[in-house]
Amino acid sequence: MKTKFIFITGGVLSSLGKGLAAASVGALLKARGLKVTIQKLDPYINVDPGTMNPFQHGEVYVTDDGAETDLDLGHYERYLAEPMSQKNNYTSGSIYHRVITKERRGDYLGGTVQVIPHVTDEIKNAVLSLAEDDPDVALIEIGGTVGDIEGLPFLEAIRQLRGDLGKDRCLYIHLTLVPYLRAAGEHKTKPTQHSVKELRSIGIQPDIILCRCEEAITADLKRKIALFCNVDQDAVFSAVDVKNIYEVPLRFYEEGFDQKIAIMLRLPAKNPNLEPWETLVDTCAHPQGRVTIGIVGKYVDLKEAYKSLHEALVHGGVANKVAVDLKYVNSEEITEENVAEALKGLDGILVPGGFGYRGVEGKILTIRYARENRVPFFGICLGMQCAVIEFARNVMGLEDANSEEFNELSKNKVIYLMTEWFDHRRQAVERRDSSSDKGGTMRLGSYPCVVVPDTKAHDAYGVKHIDERHRHRFEFNKAYFDAMAQSGMVFSGLSPDGELVEIVELPDHPWFLGCQFHPEFKSNPMQPHPLFREFIRAAKTHPAGKR
């Protein structure tokens, strides 16, 4: 079967949940036995989100091949349990970069380079590249909102693709808002009508309309939307607000959403096996206990900055049959005077990754509190580096211990800038210095790690060799390896050549572990990551009330 393409657009306003909708449809089609992939096309001019402020963009999601991508790729991987790659996320910046590179190389033979056909052709090439892996279905999410000027080339490209591929291989789904006005006591369809009108003016007639709403819309409203938007009544579906995002595939299935897609694209009509999803949702709905985890960072005002962390902690809760309540703590506000009060009642503390000095001292105070008060602690990326700094200062007595990132004049730079390493394929040496560009210049992607036996890390993984995803410029300074080991720090994960420290832990603590990589990027609800599973287990076993 030739690959079928499903294009998902959004209207009225942003943040309606196109990524979750795409991931949920993908999960349903995969449950039917189909091979599925998903792509995100982002209209912004940045080449990738790697240098974007988390407060503006949210989390940067890293794939195995080192691509810095939109957080929606995290949804795709978690719902499909399939790895994404660079080809699953393109931006206007990356598309234009390709076009300009070709123009400079002379590929256009002196022709005038224009949005149509050159930019739109490059977008189409990006979409069609998904077919190289022979999926049965490829879902393509168009970022932004219909009507945004920067999204026009992408909409024009997917309009052309229906003509290129044929109607039997393309399907357009439009996600829109149907607000409920409590004062009037009714849903309003006018925003949807105008959104579809805008889409049709571009040349795209949606085949299915998905209505984001607080409560399911009635049959009468579906008839009205179908009439004004020129679709079949049975092609109008509700996307109702849910308490747990993992309910969405089940809600779509109850609506017959995947069945309609299968009929319209003439896909094999095998009934989906949704038992794993039903079990997952039931486990979340009926926990056998609760734990409270504090996430101490500086991006806490935008929860999307820690999206994969949030989900990985939920997965850890599922593995332990407990609900995970999250408390976000701003590390910039933590002082020696208030640290105990700020962290009171937490069953576990997690210090996530980040960049820059702002908020770091609050993280270090947090880690000292967790170490001294035997609170289960998990440090990720910068969180691990801060744990090393805290240990050097307060256990080894190196009062000026710091990271080269924060204080280049420190005499004890226990964390320093990596200047040379193999790429994630181990095929080439990467070299950087302090003057290198910021974008795409970190140690990125999946790298192997050797886990030391008889450690908490090995107890969690159960194997010696693992692969985890990285996103960092700074690394543990091996000059302090022996001194720290003699002071009680255990280096439980190393690169295969032994040169890079990947995991640290304290053996005389209920659970104190830091890792240089980002394990949250490899967790999904059906297979919770081992470190998150064990972290939540420790929080459950050593709750605040028993310490």
UniProtKB/Swiss-Prot annotation:
Protein keywords = ATP-binding, Glutamine amidotransferase, Ligase, Magnesium, Metal-binding, Nucleotide-binding, Pyrimidine biosynthesis
Q: What class of enzyme is it?
A: ligase
Explain the regulation of its activity.
Allosterically activated by GTP, when glutamine is the substrate; GTP has no effect on the reaction when ammonia is the substrate. The allosteric effector GTP functions by stabilizing the protein conformation that binds the tetrahedral intermediate(s) formed during glutamine hydrolysis. Inhibited by the product CTP, via allosteric rather than competitive inhibition.
Any Gene Ontology biological process:
'de novo' CTP biosynthetic process
- The protein's Enzyme Commission number: 6.3.4.2
Q: In which pathway does it act?
A: Pyrimidine metabolism; CTP biosynthesis via de novo pathway; CTP from UDP: step 2/2
The UniProt record gives the binding positions of UTP as: S14, K188, T189, K190, P191, T192, Q193, K224
- Please tell me where ATP binds in this chain: S15, L16, G17, K18, G19, L20, D72
All copies of the Glutamine amidotransferase type-1 domain together span: 292-545
Q: Where does CTP bind?
A: S14, D148, I149, E150, K188, T189, K190, P191, T192, Q193, K224
Q: Where is this region: Amidoligase domain?
A: 1-267
- Single GO molecular function: metal ion binding
Q: Which Gene3D superfamilies match?
A: 3.40.50.880, P-loop containing nucleotide triphosphate hydrolases
The catalysed reaction is: UTP + L-glutamine + ATP + H2O = CTP + L-glutamate + ADP + phosphate + 2 H(+); L-glutamine + H2O = L-glutamate + NH4(+); UTP + NH4(+) + ATP = CTP + ADP + phosphate + 2 H(+)
Q: Which GO terms describe its cellular component?
A: cytosol
Active site per UniProt: C381, H518, E520
Q: Name one Pfam family in it.
A: GATase
Query: Where does the chain bind L-glutamine?
Result: G354, L382, G383, M384, Q385, E405, R473
Has UniProt tagged this entry with the keyword Amino-acid biosynthesis? no
Q: Which CDD domains match?
A: CTPS_N, GATase1_CTP_Synthase
State the protein's purpose: Catalyzes the ATP-dependent amination of UTP to CTP with either L-glutamine or ammonia as the source of nitrogen. Regulates intracellular CTP levels through interactions with the four ribonucleotide triphosphates.
Instruction: List the PANTHER family hit by this protein, alphabetically.
Output: CTP SYNTHASE, CTP SYNTHASE-RELATED
**Subunit structure and binding partners:** Homotetramer.
Q: NCBIfam families per the record? A: PRK05380.1 (NF003792), PyrG (TIGR00337)
The miscellaneous comment for this protein is:
CTPSs have evolved a hybrid strategy for distinguishing between UTP and CTP. The overlapping regions of the product feedback inhibitory and substrate sites recognize a common feature in both compounds, the triphosphate moiety. To differentiate isosteric substrate and product pyrimidine rings, an additional pocket far from the expected kinase/ligase catalytic site, specifically recognizes the cytosine and ribose portions of the product inhibitor.
The protein's name: CTP synthase
